[in-house]
Design a protein with these regions (language model features):
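Active-site C-terminal subdomain of aminotransferase-like
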Residues: 1-64, 70
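A generic structural signal for alpha-helix starts
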Residues: 41, 56, 60, 109-113, ...
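PLP-dependent enzyme catalytic core of the Aspartate aminotransferase-like
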Residues: 109-110, 117-161
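Conserved small-domain helix->loop->beta segment predominantly found in fold-type I
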Residues: 24, 30-34, 53-106
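Short, flexible turn/loop "capping" segments at secondary-structure junctions
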Residues: 42, 95-97, 127-130
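Short loop segments at secondary-structure junctions
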Residues: 1-3, 107-110
């Protein structure tokens, strides 16, 4: 089944493109979604990104993703055991293959207030209703030290409600 889409020059059948016919003859598949020439200058960052991924390799990124997310999970469990005021639960599955590099943490107590205080302390997280903070230790640019520092900041904020 074809979905509605813009009828662009590069989405038109290559064999008929230069015939300049009034009807759109779509290319099937992903190529059919192209509308026009790609703006070359805005693509430069993508090239750098692709080169970085190629240099590091997906296997290494996946390994670090699993290790750093497990470390963050460990830190959260330790805070939960250590502090009486830590009233949260990790919603994301513990199985590494089911979660990628994100942990969704349900906050029973402080909710949005804790999120706002984390942001004021330089911790970039994501807020979702109801009362969920999403933590994403991206393996390309987050370090294990970043996770440790996050844990220290979180403990401090919970202790000083």
């Amino acid at each position: 089944k074809e979905l509605s889409r813009f009828a662009g020059w590069y989405g038109h059948n290559k064999e008929r493109r230069f015939k300049m016919e009034p009807d759109f003859d779509p290319v099937h598949g992903a190529d059919g979604w192209q509308v026009s020439n790609l703006p070359i200058l805005s693509l430069a960052p993508y090239l750098a990104s692709v080169e970085m991924f190629a240099e590091v390799g997906m296997d290494k990124l996946i390994t670090k993703r699993n290790l750093i997310t497990s470390y963050l999970e460990f830190i959260l469990h330790e805070i939960d055991k250590e502090l009486e005021g830590a009233d949260f639960e990790i919603l994301t599955p513990s199985n590494q293959e089911e979660r990628g590099c994100q942990l969704s943490v349900y906050l029973h107590g402080q909710g949005r207030e804790l999120f706002d205080r984390l942001m004021k302390n330089g911790v970039i997280t994501d807020w979702r209703e109801p009362n969920v903070i999403r933590l994403a230790p991206a393996p390309f640019y987050c370090s294990f030290e970043d996770m440790y520092e996050f844990g220290q900041i979180l403990k401090e904020l919970i202790l000083n409600k």
